[in-house]
């Protein structure tokens, strides 16, 4: 998944949700168990989907699609007209999911990042 100890900590996610209070969603079962979530936001110009997850036992039931659609509507309501995201190239299921939803791969781009603090990967 690409998680790390700083921005994916409870404090990091809380800070993110405070900055983006209307564009991220969770889905709960009737028993109150979270089985899906999406973290998304925008910079005033472009929307970004940062994390999307559905528990393995609840996949292929439309939960991910419903979460994405809710986020896209929320971003559109805030005047955002284009949304971007990053998917690991080796994530075949994830890439197929986003392609089915109309997200196209971009050629000619190289994704780069730089940690400003020491981080530890906590990939699941």
Predicted segments with their positions:
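Active-site rim helix/loop that mediates acceptor-substrate recognition in acyltransferases
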Residues: 2-29
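Glycine-rich acetyl-CoA-binding "A-motif" of GNAT/NAT acetyltransferases
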Residues: 29-36, 93, 106
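Conserved beta-strand in the GNAT
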Residues: 32-41, 48-53
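Conserved acetyl-CoA binding element of GNAT-fold acetyltransferases
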Residues: 45-56, 85, 110-113
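Conserved acetyl-CoA-binding loop-helix of GNAT-fold acetyltransferases
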Residues: 51-56, 60-73, 96-100
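Conserved GNAT acetyl-CoA-binding A-motif
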Residues: 68, 75-87
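Conserved beta-strand-loop-alpha-helix junction that forms the acyl-donor binding cleft
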Residues: 85-94, 113-117
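Conserved acetyl-CoA-binding loop of GNAT-fold acetyltransferases
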Residues: 99-108
């Amino acid at each position: 998944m690409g998680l790390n100890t700083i921005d994916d900590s409870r404090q990091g996610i809380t800070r993110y949700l405070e900055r983006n209070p209307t564009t991220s969603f969770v889905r709960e079962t009737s028993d109150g168990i979270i089985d899906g979530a999406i973290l998304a936001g925008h910079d005033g110009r472009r929307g970004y989907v940062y994390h999307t997850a559905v528990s393995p036992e609840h996949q292929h039931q439309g939960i991910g699609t419903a979460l994405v659609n809710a986020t896209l509507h929320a971003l559109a309501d805030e005047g955002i007209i284009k949304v971007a995201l990053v998917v690991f190239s080796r994530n075949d299921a994830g890439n197929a999911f986003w392609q089915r939803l109309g997200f196209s791969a971009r050629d000619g781009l190289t994704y780069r990042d730089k940690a400003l603090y020491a981080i530890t990967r906590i990939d699941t």
